């Protein structure tokens, strides 16, 4: 009785489509969840070379900008940490040429990707936390553009795995907010507003994308099963037809 009342309330308040998505998601079988997780990990693995190259190029840009600042002496240490995380990602992950995980690999690779994204987000966030307050205006401009680009693009590159987006963006956004606040809220109102818009808009978009991604994976699996069943039925029909002709 309570569940029916709650469902009716949700249908009236949020709409039938929203509730039906929750119901379908909750009714997903363990096999379907494994299939969705497999496709999520595979999608992330395909983009890992692009992400690794982007991290390396961005770190080089940051190092070049910091070489002209008062923090030039400690900038190489930050760059070494970024290189260490990149090497860790390469060595601990699957082949960079694209890899569809086996059933037994899905859970480990799923959480490995999330942990690696958190490390990258923390390193990028530390760039602002360590260097922004004492940097010159031109260096601040480079750091702001660079960090904003990585924060925004993470929602697209990692969209197949929403938890990875949050693992990457949360530490980065928090450290950017702290850095901008320390440098003066009034002078960085625009940047703080952009982060606020990101925090409000992208989770909604990610949720919709994740629902559509899961529905598409399950639908394609069902189509494959039905196609296989039809092929078997046609094969049996052809075999029986040949017996009748004989």
Model-derived segments and spans:
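Hydrophobic transmembrane alpha-helical segments in integral membrane proteins
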Residues: 6-15, 41-55
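Hydrophobic alpha-helical transmembrane segments of multi-pass membrane proteins
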Residues: 26, 30-31, 44-100, 196-197, ...
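Juxtamembrane helix-capping/reentrant segments at transmembrane boundaries
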Residues: 101-117
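PAS/LOV and related PAS-like sensory modules
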Residues: 228-246
């Amino acid at each position: 009785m309570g569940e029916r009342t709650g469902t009716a309330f949700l249908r009236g308040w949020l709409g039938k489509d929203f509730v039906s998505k929750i119901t379908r998601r909750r009714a997903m079988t363990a096999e379907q969840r494994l299939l969705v997780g497999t496709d999520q990990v595979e999608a992330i693995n395909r983009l890992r070379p692009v992400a690794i190259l982007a991290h390396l190029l961005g770190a080089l840009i940051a190092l070049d900008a910091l070489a002209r600042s008062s923090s030039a002496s400690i900038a190489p240490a930050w760059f070494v940490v970024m290189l260490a995380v990149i090497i860790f990602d390469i060595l601990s992950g699957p082949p960079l040429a694209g890899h569809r995980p086996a059933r037994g690999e899905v859970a480990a690779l799923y959480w490995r990707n999330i942990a690696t994204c958190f490390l990258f987000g923390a390193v990028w966030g530390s760039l602002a936390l360590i260097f922004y307050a004492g940097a010159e205006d031109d260096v601040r401009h480079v750091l702001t553009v660079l960090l904003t680009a990585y924060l925004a693009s993470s929602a697209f590159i990692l969209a197949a795995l929403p938890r990875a987006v949050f693992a990457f963006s949360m530490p980065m956004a928090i450290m950017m907010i702290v850095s901008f606040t320390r440098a003066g809220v009034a002078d960085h109102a625009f940047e703080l507003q952009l982060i606020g818009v990101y925090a409000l808009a992208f989770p909604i978009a990610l949720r919709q994308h994740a629902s559509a991604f899961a529905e598409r994976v399950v639908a394609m699996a069902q189509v494959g099963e039905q196609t296989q069943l039809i092929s078997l039925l046609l094969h049996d029909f052809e075999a029986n037809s040949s017996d009748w002709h004989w």
